[in-house]
Amino acid sequence: MNKALFLCLVVLCAAVVFAAEDLQKAKHAPFKRGAAGAAICICPDKVGRGDLWLFRGDCPGGYGYTSDCYVWPNICCYPH
C-alpha cells in the first residue's frame, strides 16, 4: 500500500470517528419543539403556559420544571 492511500484511509477513519461523536452528543440532547422558541401548551388545571416537549414520558431535568400534564403523545411542563 502506498503512503498516499494509507494517509487517505487514516483521514477517512478520523472523520468517521469525529462524526460519530457529534451524532452521539446530538442524540442525548433533549428535543424541544421549535428551534428558536418552544411551542407553548396550556393544561386545564394550571395557570399560565408551559413548554411542550415532543414524545417524552416525563419532563427533562435541569430546566426548573415542577409540574406537568400529558398532551398525548407529548408532555407539557410547568413553570414556563
UniProtKB/Swiss-Prot annotation:
Disulfide bonds join C41-C76, C43-C69, C59-C77. One of its GO terms (molecular function) is ion channel inhibitor activity. One of its GO terms (cellular component) is nematocyst. The keyword Cell inner membrane does not apply. Moderately expressed in the ectodermal tissue from the distal and proximal tentacles, body wall, and oral disk. One of its GO terms (biological process) is regulation of blood pressure. Residues 1-19 form the signal peptide. Residues 20-31 form a propeptide. It is found in: Secreted; Nematocyst. It comes from the Eukaryota. Belongs to the sea anemone type 3 (BDS) potassium channel toxin family. This is Kappa-actitoxin-Avd4f. It comes from Anemonia viridis. The lineage of its organism: Eukaryota, Metazoa, Cnidaria, Anthozoa, Hexacorallia.
